[in-house]
Amino acid sequence: YEISACLVGSEMCIRDSTKTMGKGDKVVLYTSIPKNFKYDTPVIKIPTTSSVLKVSVNGKLVYTYGEDRYAENKLVGSGWHYIPVKKTDAGKNIRIIITSTEDATFSSIDAPVLMEYSDVFQQMMIKNRVPYVSAVSLILFGALIMALAGIMMIKRTGMSRLFWIGALSVTVGTWTACNYRLTQLFNIPLPVTTTLEYINLVLGALSVAMYFNCLLYTSP
């Protein structure tokens, strides 16, 4: 699917219908780099979901991600990419190719954004401050509850439910951090982030199951 210029809005429309990407499907975006940008260290921010990414400026490949992992049938991961742009690239044409590596990966694409590299993490924190604060709070609260429950379990029974509440809090917090890409602040690779996201979904469900299991067997 080829689309001229940056996408307007958030939905990817092909022939007036919304298209969900399948494995191997490609979207090609065409646009041009603004001629009069004033950034000292410009980058183009492009988010992807389980996709291979290729970026070319005036036909020259300047950035690629995930192609080797996709060829080896490995998890590619999801997250933000920051492609460096030279000041001499102003006004040049840019082509962005996004290749889905899984079925039903996404049905919308956020428009690429030209920005100053030094503002990347500040904007990331401002835009996602509520999820980030929630994630950190849940992780710290859960870890504290698990530690207290672990100590109390040595002296008395019936504290396992409290332990699993803490475990659920940690898993929800970690999943939130991964889902909102807080982990990219620490340069954690995208495949690792996505793997942690999946693992914590499973661990969260396990924590809920263990809580009700303890509730069942400790009920009078």
Question: At which residue positions do the language-model features occur?
Answer:
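Conserved small/polar residues in nucleotide/adenosyl-binding loops
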Residues: 1-3, 7-16, 217-220
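Extended carbohydrate-recognition surfaces in non-catalytic/accessory domains of CAZymes
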Residues: 10-11, 15-38
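Individual alpha-helical transmembrane segments in multi-pass integral membrane proteins
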Residues: 123-219
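Beta-strand-rich ligand-recognition modules
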Residues: 53, 57-93, 99-110
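Short, well-structured beta-strand segments within conserved domains
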Residues: 27, 33, 40-46, 89-103
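Exposed low-complexity, polar/acidic, P/S/T/G-rich flexible segments that act as propeptides
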Residues: 103-131
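Aromatic-lined ligand-binding clefts that engage carbohydrates, nucleic acids, or primary amines
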Residues: 38-57
